[in-house]
């Protein structure tokens, strides 16, 4: 976590804009070529356009040149608690790596980035573009949900629904109310984009600002429906959940019917464009800082499956013989000297690797789980499960071979810590790859989620959320010192405590939230509203 001064990172400035009055009418009244964007609309969009990359750059915190925000909010949080990666920084045995979740205020960062970067940019678009450019505002709403569902899934309740309304302190909302607002916002955005696309197919008014889909509203529409499906599944263990009379099942079925991501060309990926360089911050974490290596959990599972994607996800270590070069570390090892741990496998994520928000494989696995639950997902469970695996292999350019039909010999294996490192432990799961309709329901669910977890790499925040929701994949307990003072089990935290800054500046409201929504304890062992299995 040092300042990285040598990396040149072109960011989008939010300097003064000349507010040029637009003379465009509503897009439905254009009397022009429907595939083109009128010049006066493009000029008008200058008022709000640069706020879109500001939002996009911090859905997953990517905007700071030294990657400190990403490291503390993502890599030392979801990437770690999901089992994908293990930090090897020399922070001692009382850090967040050992479940001291308030260590060095790491727990403040995800909240800070969302409420000082993303939400103010959204507010600018809301105030200056909602009426004049409803189709652009729809994308801003989708970006807001894409960001804030990650944040509420870290902390739980948030001061969210009254953001920007003024006042010295902002009240917190329950996670249930926040989630309900997500579905309302997504449905409104979906309707708006559908209307726009029906009148102006192929038009891309946000092309010069959008770093994810290049202004392609058809892809934004699929992403919105896919996000709706993801969030509907997140509520699957909440009894009686409804939004405007619609159950989790109905919300999920609507999303699939309206059209979700089905191809890798539709994956939500943040990447360089329009004069803005997106430098993947994970590369800084593993290379410049040498603070992270492969996790023992992903080694155990993928080695047991002889999964060819392992060589796509990680680099060979300096340990082992030919054919056995991928080695990781247990979460919780007390690293006092990096010299042995630095030789372990690093993520194969480089400066120009796009930052993944969502992939087609995840959506197929969501649909497989939905069908497993009896929902109409446009296919059968086995078909969708296999499609998820296939799409993941295609995404990473790995050969599928006989992977889908591998027998019982292919299952997670013992983790053996290389010489000079610690944490050897037996495998904690025996789940296999091949779909078996005769298996128990719980075994079927474990199989779906384990493969989904593999496919979502390296997006650890979503993997951690799904681990908390389902209990899968089965992960190793924390190795070594548990520094949580009894506030977190060795199986991992369920949330992060609220930021210290909230106790300093929003004192009354954060204390009220702890009392009302968390049972009086702002601890890491308090389950979120949807963590109800």
Predicted regions and their residues:
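C-terminal functional modules
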Residues: 397-533
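Short coil/turn segments at secondary-structure boundaries
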Residues: 67-71, 313-316, 460-469
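Phosphate/oxyanion-binding loops and surfaces in catalytic or ligand/nucleic-acid-binding neighborhoods
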Residues: 17, 58, 62, 391
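Membrane-proximal, proline-rich intrinsically disordered regions
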Residues: 23-83, 124, 473, 485-533
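Short acidic (Asp/Glu) and glycine-rich catalytic loops that position anionic groups and cofactors
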Residues: 31, 344-346, 424-429
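Sec-dependent bacterial lipoprotein signal peptides
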Residues: 1-21
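Structured, solvent-exposed acidic/aromatic patches
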Residues: 42, 86-143, 147-402, 437-446, ...
């Amino acid at each position: 976590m040092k300042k990285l001064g040598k990396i040149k990172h072109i960011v989008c400035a939010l300097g003064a804009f000349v507010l040029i009055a637009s003379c465009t009418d509503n897009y439905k009244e254009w009397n022009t070529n429907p595939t083109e964007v009128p010049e006066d609309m493009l000029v008008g969009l200058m008022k709000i356009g640069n706020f879109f990359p500001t939002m996009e750059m911090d859905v997953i915190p990517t905007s700071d040149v030294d990657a400190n925000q990403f490291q503390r909010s993502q890599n030392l949080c979801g990437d770690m608690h999901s089992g994908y990666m293990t930090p090897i920084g020399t922070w001692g045995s009382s850090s967040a790596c050992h479940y001291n979740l308030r260590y060095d205020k790491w727990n403040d960062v995800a909240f800070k980035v969302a409420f000082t970067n993303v939400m103010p940019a959204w507010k600018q678009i809301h105030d200056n573009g909602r009426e004049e450019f409803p189709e652009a505002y729809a994308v801003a709403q989708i970006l807001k949900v894409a960001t804030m569902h990650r944040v509420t899934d870290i902390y739980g309740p948030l001061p969210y629904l009254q953001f920007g309304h003024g006042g010295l302190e902002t009240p917190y909302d329950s996670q249930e109310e926040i989630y309900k607002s997500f579905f309302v916002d997504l449905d409104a955005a979906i309707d708006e984009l559908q209307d726009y696309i029906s009148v102006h197919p192929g038009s891309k008014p946000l092309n010069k600002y959008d770093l994810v889909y290049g202004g392609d509203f058809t892809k934004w529409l699929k992403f919105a429906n896919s996000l709706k499906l993801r969030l509907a599944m997140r509520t699957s263990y909440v009894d009686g959940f409804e939004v405007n009379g619609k159950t989790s099942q109905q919300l999920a079925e609507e999303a699939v019917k309206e059209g979700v991501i089905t191809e890798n060309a539709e994956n939500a990926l943040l990447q360089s464009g329009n004069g803005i360089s997106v430098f993947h911050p994970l590369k800084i974490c593993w290379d410049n800082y040498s603070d992270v290596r492969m996790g023992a959990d992903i080694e155990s599972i993928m080695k047991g499956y002889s999964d060819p994607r392992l060589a796509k996800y990680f680099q060979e270590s300096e340990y082992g013989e030919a054919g056995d070069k991928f080695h990781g570390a247990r979460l919780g090892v007390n690293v006092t000297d990096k010299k042995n741990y630095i030789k372990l496998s690093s993520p194969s994520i480089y400066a120009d690797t796009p930052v993944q928000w969502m992939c087609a494989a995840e959506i197929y696995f969501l649909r497989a789980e939905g069908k497993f639950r009896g929902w109409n997902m446009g296919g059968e469970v086995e078909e969708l499960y296999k499609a998820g695996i296939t799409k993941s292999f295609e995404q990473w350019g790995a050969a599928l071979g006989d992977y889908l039909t591998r027998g019982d010999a292919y299952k997670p294996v013992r983790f053996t810590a290389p010489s000079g490192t610690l944490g050897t432990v037996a495998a904690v799961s025996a789940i296999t790859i091949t779909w078996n309709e005769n298996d128990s329901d719980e075994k079927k669910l474990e199989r779906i989620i384990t493969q989904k977890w593999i496919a979502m790499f390296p997006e650890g925040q979503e993997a951690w959320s799904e681990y908390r929701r389902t209990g899968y994949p089965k992960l190793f307990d924390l190795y070594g010192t548990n520094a949580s003072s009894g506030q977190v089990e060795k199986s991992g935290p369920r949330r992060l405590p609220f930021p210290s800054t909230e106790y300093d500046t929003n004192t009354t409201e954060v204390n009220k939230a702890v009392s009302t929504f968390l049972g009086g304890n702002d601890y890491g062992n308090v389950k979120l509203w949807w963590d109800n299995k």
